[in-house]
Amino acid sequence: SLGGFLKGVGKVLAGVGKVVADQFGNLLEAGQ
């Protein structure tokens, strides 16, 4: 179903966003 598909996409985007945020935080800490 479309709802299930969108939920799956949301999960993937949330996971990617978390990884990117973690990496960005590491870069900021390294830059200080």
Swiss-Prot record:
Modification Glutamine amide, positions: Q32
Primary location group: secreted
GO biological process: defense response
Tissues expressed in: Expressed by the skin glands.
Domain of life assignment: Eukaryota
Subcellular location: Secreted
Keywords recorded for this protein, A-Z: Amidation, Amphibian defense peptide, Antimicrobial, Secreted
An example Gene Ontology CC term for this record: extracellular region
Role played: Antimicrobial peptide.
Similarity annotation: Belongs to the frog skin active peptide (FSAP) family. Dermatoxin subfamily.
Name assigned to this protein: Dermatoxin-J3
